Amino acid sequence: MYTRYSYNPSLGRTYVYDNKYYKNLGAVIKNAKRKKHQIEHEAEEHTLDPLDKYLVAEDPFLGPGKNQKLTLFKEIRNVKPDTMKLVVNWSGKEFLRETWTRFMEDSFPIVNDQEIMDVFLVINMRPTRPNRCFRFLAQHALRCDPEYVPHEVIRIVEPSYVGSNNEYRISLAKRGGGCPVMNLHAEYTNSFEEFINRVHWENFYKPIVYVGTDSAEEEEILLEVSLVFKIKEFAPDAPLYSGPAY
């Protein structure tokens, strides 16, 4: 029993406070940082407001310009499970001479006032046997050392699934955008070898591409490899109206 002289452990430790005058310290700091980040984000958005009047294509392949497709080769490859096979290696110049000759002379007349803005490597894959249920895989590299010798077969490690239409598309442009190549016909006429090495590969990457499947069996794949050139089209140098005054 407690008396007026007894020690009561609850004395001096009991108190009452109103929660509205107290806030969690962590919540205060987080709220301050959140407001600071919001102000910085709004200031950054204001600097980008002048760009709202411009339009860009989400997919550069579908952007402005004319797509000129040139089929390099078609062939059948057998791919074993859990492996990927090398299908494109630009260390050699196979398929280039015939393709570029046809491109320059027959398929598309290149003149001096036209530019190649971008080059896409397009690989279309189709199964040769019916009623097969699997997905295509692909991996590629663009910045390989010139002396690097790629393996013919590699194991599947973090591949990319091929998208719609079983088509794998790679932009070969350097520096994050198209690098215009002009005077193509004159450069090609002077020397084919110099044109490929000095003009084409100086502005675009040499790709290395592996393909495979997620099937548990060996599959036979029909490959169609092509280059798609994004040609910049200029307005014709001609009057808008034709008549006696022109």
Swiss-Prot record:
Keyword Chaperone included in the entry's annotation: no
A Gene Ontology cellular-component term: viral occlusion body
Annotated InterPro entries: Polyhedrin
Pfam family, one: Polyhedrin
Keyword Transport: no
Molecular-function annotations in GO: structural molecule activity
UniProt KW keywords: Viral occlusion body
Reported function: Major component of the virus occlusion bodies, which are large proteinaceous structures (polyhedra), that protect the virus from the outside environment for extended periods until they are ingested by insect larvae.
Family indicated by similarity: Belongs to the polyhedrin family.
Protein name per the record: Polyhedrin
Gene of this entry: PH
